[in-house]
Amino acid sequence: MVTKEDVLNALKTVADPHMGISIVDMGLIRDVEVDDEGNVKFKLIPTNPYCMSVMAMAFQAKEAVKSLEGVKKVEVTVEGHVMEKDINEMLKEKE
């Protein structure tokens, strides 16, 4: 079974392209949830509401978690960005 720690470790492999620091270490990941069926949810909150890299980071984060054995579905929600509605729609389309 996948744990919250497994998810955070996978997310540590994703770095902010401008800072070169993992999105976990930067504090951009919140509310990680893992259920017994392997469904994972978490929020990505960029440091600035106009961050141009948030889409790339969100897709990389989703793929990093999807690659974990036992993960069935990954739901990433971007919050605090001026285009969060559009970004979240695109993230859902790529399932």
From Swiss-Prot:
Gene3D superfamilies assigned: Fe-S cluster assembly (FSCA)
Residues spanning the membrane: none
Pfam entry (one): FeS_assembly_P
Signal peptide feature range: none
Entry-linked InterPro entries: Fe-S_Maturation_MIP18, FSCA_dom_sf, MIP18-like
Official protein name in the record: Uncharacterized protein MJ1129
Species of origin: Methanocaldococcus jannaschii (strain ATCC 43067 / DSM 2661 / JAL-1 / JCM 10045 / NBRC 100440)
